[in-house]
Amino acid sequence: MPPKTRAAGVKKVRRKEKKNVAHGHAHIKSTFNNTIVSITDPSGNVISWASAGHVGFKGSRKSTPFAAQMAAENAARKAQEHGMRKVDVFVKGPGSGRETAIRSLQAAGLEVGAIQDVTPTPHNGCRPPKRRRV
């Protein structure tokens, strides 16, 4: 049996290298329960991400526009550390945090280029959930 070089239970951690990307894509997925913001380089590799739950909101507060604003600001701040200055925005989903997330990306200092809605629409695919009776 070969001798162990590392102590048991110690994991080798690779540091995140600083990518220098000036232009990228911001993908905002806004569902009824949460908002996820991912900022990628043009080829689709994720540079930074944040979600309403990751920022610290729980339960029904994750679906609010304010939670989406905080998530977008957090993701934009992380992306700016990697040299990001300009983004094209792709919005997906029916949630309430769509416009707020775009506005907060601009407020955080990123220059927003094109805004595109890429919400998937079914050609009569899965049956939707039943209507709520309150």
UniProtKB/Swiss-Prot annotation:
The UniProt entry, under InterPro entries, shows: Ribosomal_uS11, Ribosomal_uS11_bac-type, Ribosomal_uS11_CS, Ribosomal_uS11_sf
Q: GO terms for CC? A: ribonucleoprotein complex; ribosome
Tell me one GO molecular function of this protein.
rRNA binding
Keywords, sorted A to Z: Ribonucleoprotein, Ribosomal protein, RNA-binding, rRNA-binding
Gene3D superfamilies documented for this protein: Ribosomal protein S11
Residues folding into a coiled coil are: none
Name a single GO biological process. translation
- Subunit arrangement? Part of the 30S ribosomal subunit. Interacts with proteins S7 and S18. Binds to IF-3.
Question: Its family?
Answer: Belongs to the universal ribosomal protein uS11 family.
The record describes the protein's role as: Located on the platform of the 30S subunit, it bridges several disparate RNA helices of the 16S rRNA. Forms part of the Shine-Dalgarno cleft in the 70S ribosome.
Question: What protein name is recorded for this chain?
Answer: Small ribosomal subunit protein uS11
